C-alpha cells in the first residue's frame, strides 16, 4: 500500500525466506465488516463488534454499561483501530490485486466458519468474518498461498526484500525522531535511511526462553512460531523509550509433549482434537475440558492452579481414545497413521495396561516434566 502511495519501501526479514510463521498457518484473516459481509447485506456495526471484542478479549474487565466497556483507554483504542482499519486494509489489498481474497469457508462443509465465541449475546455476526485466499485453481489456500500472493505482489511492484537481515536497532536524531534502522546481515551491519518511518511486524518471543520465563506464568514447552521469533523488537522498542503493554498474552495451542522436547520449534499443534470416542484427562484421570473447544481457549485449561496442592494440575493432559478412533481418524494429527508409528502415543489392551504404559513413559521423560506422575487420588 505504501508503495502504491508513491513511497519507497524496503522490507527487512530476519529469516532466510519470506512468509514467516504466517506461511505455516491456515491463512485465515479475521476481518469485521468485510467486503464479503457488506456484499451480502450483513450489518456488522462498530458498536456491536466492539462489545463482542471486549467481551471475548477482556472478559474480566468487560462491562456493557461502563466507559470504554470497562477497558483501559489504550485497550479500547486498540480494538477501535482494528475495527476501523482491518476492512479498509483488506479492501485496498484486493483492489491492488495483492490478494485473491474470498469469504473463508470450511473445506468440505462449504459453509462460513463460526466465530470461536459464537454463542454470546454480544456477537451479532456469529459467522462470516473469516477471510481467506484462493489459489490459481480456485481452491481455498493455506498460509503458504496467502504469503505467496503477497510475495508475488512485492516482486511485481519492485519492492526489495532483504532476507537474513535482522533488525538490530533504530537510528534517531537529536529530537528523538526515528530516521533509520540498523540491521545485521551475518557479521555485517546494514544502515537503512528512513524518510518517513520504520514499521515493525514482530513474530513474538516464544523462542526466547528467557522472555518466556519472565513473562509467561504457564509453561510454554514449544511453539509453532518460526525459530527466528526471539522477541528482538522488545529491546529495539525499549531502547527508544517505548512502553511495553501486556507481555503475558499468548495465542495457545496444545501439542504432544514429546514432540516439544525433541525440538522447541514444532511443525504443528493440535488445531482441533480428532475423534468422537476420545477424551482428555489430567494426571488424576479427571476430564476437565471440552475437547472440541477451539484450540486457543481449550489450551487455557493447562494454566489452572490448585492452591491446596500448590501445582498446575493440568500441566500435562492425556488424550485417551479407543481402537475405533485410532482407525477412523488415523492420520488426523495427533493421531498417527498407524498406532505406535510416532514418538508420543502409547497403547494398552485395558485401562490398567494403558496406565502402566503411561507410568513408564512419564518416568522416561520425568526430567522434562518436573516429575509428573499419575495420581489416583
Predicted regions and their residues:
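Glycine-rich FAD pyrophosphate-binding loop
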Residues: 4-25
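Hydrophobic "anchor" residues
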Residues: 18, 29, 178, 287-288
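FAD-binding core of FAD-dependent oxidoreductases
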Residues: 18-33, 197, 205
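Glycine-rich active-site loop/strand segments that organize a redox cofactor
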Residues: 31-81
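Conserved redox-cofactor binding core of oxidoreductases
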Residues: 70-188, 209-210, 257-258, 377
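Glycine-rich loop(s) and the adjacent beta-strand/alpha-helix scaffold that form part
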Residues: 186-189, 193-261, 306
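An anion/pyrophosphate-binding glycine-rich loop and adjacent beta-alpha core
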Residues: 234, 243-374
Amino acid at each position: 500500500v505504501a508503495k502504491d502511495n508513491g513511497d519507497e519501501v524496503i522490507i527487512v526479514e530476519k529469516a532466510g525466506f519470506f512468509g514467516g510463521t504466517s506461511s505455516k498457518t491456515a491463512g485465515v484473516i479475521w476481518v469485521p465488516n468485510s467486503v464479503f459481509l457488506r456484499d451480502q447485506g450483513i450489518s456488522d456495526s462498530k458498536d456491536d463488534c466492539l462489545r463482542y471484542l471486549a467481551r471475548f478479549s477482556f472478559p474480566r474487565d468487560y462491562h456493557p454499561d461502563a466507559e470504554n466497556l470497562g477497558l483501559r483507554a489504550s485497550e479500547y483504542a486498540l480494538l477501535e483501530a482494528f475495527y476501523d482499519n482491518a476492512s479498509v486494509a483488506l479492501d485496498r489489498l484486493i483492489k491492488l490485486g495483492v490478494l485473491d481474497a474470498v469469504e473463508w469457508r470450511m473445506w468440505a462443509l462449504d459453509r462460513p466458519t463460526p466465530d470461536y465465541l459464537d454463542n454470546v449475546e454480544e456477537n451479532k455476526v456469529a459467522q462470516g468474518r473469516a477471510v481467506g485466499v484462493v489459489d490459481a485453481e480456485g481452491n481455498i489456500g493455506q498460509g503458504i498461498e496467502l504469503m505467496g500472493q503477497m510475495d508475488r505482489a512485492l516482486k511485481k511492484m519492485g519492492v526489495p526484500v532483504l532476507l537474513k537481515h535482522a533488525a538490530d536497532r533504530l537510528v534517531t536524531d537529536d529530537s528523538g525522531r526515528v530516521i533509520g534502522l540498523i540491521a545485521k546481515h551475518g557479521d555485517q551491519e546494514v544502515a537503512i535511511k528512513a524518510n518517513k518511518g520504520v514499521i515493525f511486524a514482530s513474530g513474538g518471543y516464544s523462542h526466547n526462553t528467557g522472555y518466556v520465563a519472565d513473562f509467561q506464568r504457564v509453561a510454554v514447552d514449544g511453539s509453532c512460531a518460526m525459530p527466528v521469533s526471539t522477541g528482538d523488537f522488545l529491546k529495539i522498542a525499549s531502547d527508544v523509550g517505548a512502553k511495553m503493554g501486556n507481555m503475558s498474552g499468548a495465542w495457545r495451542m496444545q501439542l504432544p509433549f514429546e514432540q516439544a522436547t525433541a525440538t522447541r520449534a514444532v511443525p504443528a499443534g493440535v488445531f482441533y482434537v480428532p475423534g468422537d470416542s476420545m477424551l482428555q484427562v489430567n494426571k488424576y484421570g479427571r476430564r476437565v475440558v471440552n475437547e472440541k473447544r477451539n484450540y486457543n481457549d481449550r489450551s487455557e485449561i493447562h494454566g489452572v492452579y490448585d492452591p491446596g496442592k500448590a501445582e498446575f494440575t493440568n500441566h500435562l493432559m492425556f488424550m485417551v481414545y479407543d481402537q475405533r478412533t485410532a482407525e477412523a481418524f488415523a492420520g488426523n494429527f495427533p493421531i498417527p497413521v498407524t498406532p505406535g508409528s510416532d514418538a508420543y502415543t502409547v497403547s494398552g489392551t485395558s485401562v490398567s495396561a494403558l496406565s502402566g504404559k503411561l507410568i513408564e513413559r512419564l518416568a522416561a521423560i520425568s526430567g522434562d516434566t518436573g516429575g509428573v506422575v499419575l495420581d489416583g487420588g
